[in-house]
Amino acid sequence: TLLLRMCMMKTANLVAKFIKCQCLITGESLGQVASQTLENMAVTESCCELPLLRPLVGMDKEEIVTIAKEIGTYETSILPYEDCCVLFSPKHPVIKAKLEDAHTLYNALNVDDLIQEAFKNREIKMFSARNYVWENFNN
């Protein structure tokens, strides 16, 4: 899962730079899942060239669910499907990855060309919560 997250971060960087974003924002919350320990989040962040913001990092699940309901993303988040993190999740995930080891394994996969190919064949769809957030910010 951690190597997959490294790939996703590298891909997100390419897309973000292409659409001229100044940062990446994730929904990670410290300790919620195995990939979200300090050590593992450091590994994921090491693949990020842009500033990485984690506004939910110190929130518990209940707080995150409340926010998701407020911004209209909760119903989507509970749809029953197996995403890539579930399908490829190891039985005993690493919770304290070592940065050097993670990069050694990542480099052995030789996926950078695949990431470039995926980016080349990208399809970008833009979604904005700006109006919702702004309306609620002013109330």
Please annotate each region the language model reported:
Residues 1-66, 70-71, 114, 119-132:
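Active-site adenylate/phosphate-handling loop in enzymes that bind or generate adenylated species
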Residues 32, 80-88:
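Small/polar glycine-rich anion-binding or flexible loop at a beta-alpha turn
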Residues 36-39, 88-92:
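Short secondary-structure transition/capping segments
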Residues 46, 94-109, 117, 123-139:
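RNA-binding accessory domains that recognize and position tRNA/RNA substrates
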Residues 52, 74, 95:
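Glycine-rich, flexible loop/turn motifs
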Residues 72-81:
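A short alpha-helix-loop-beta-strand transition element characteristic
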